[in-house]
Curated annotation (Swiss-Prot):
Region (Disordered): 55-216
Protein name per its UniProtKB record: Uncharacterized protein B0034.4
Organism this protein belongs to: Caenorhabditis elegans
Taxonomy, superkingdom: Eukaryota
Biased composition (Basic and acidic residues): 134-152, 177-187, 207-216
Amino acid sequence: MLSLTAHLVLISTIIVKCSAFSKKPSERAKPAAVKKAVEDKQPVKVTAFEQASLNEDKAEAMSNIEPSPKISNSTVPTAPTPKKEKKVVATTKKTERSVAQGPPLVSEHIKDEKKMPSVHKPIRKGSIYANELLTEKPLTDTEPELHPDNHVVKAKSPKPVARTPTARHRNALKPGKINDKSDDTLHDAPSIQKVGGPSYEDAASVNEKEKDVNPK
């Protein structure tokens, strides 16, 4: 049978272990070997009981850490998503079968002939304007041919001029009479005879005659 001292040691160890488990992991005292190893920065030799206590400490520390608030997607700037480009597939168009046609000049001539048959009618010779070629005028034998060489230009007659009142009075007078209403001078109408009266020419001729008769 065990001695009394051995029983006391066992009871004390059980009490210590129970008290250690009753405390929180942060309040538990770490073993001296672990403290010394941490201070010396040496690899720690941990028993299974000590490893369990360390794991509990880590779990409690992780539970005490407050979770960071989640950032909403509206505040975070998002990069624009690249647009998907459609792939361009090169396709060859089928060539349509066409009926062989004549040269363009021949086909245009046929179309014009159907639309405007009057173009091929006989036209007057010497027409120098394009509009005269397309006009449909009846041609007769009596119609003379218009040619630039045979065309005669008639002289235009002068416009009638209104006669002035003086001209009408002058023509109405008989020869040898003066029209008192006219402003014409003798130089304008030299055929009219002078009316008797003194003039500068007569006075000068009289003075010359007197000088010849009575010389000083």
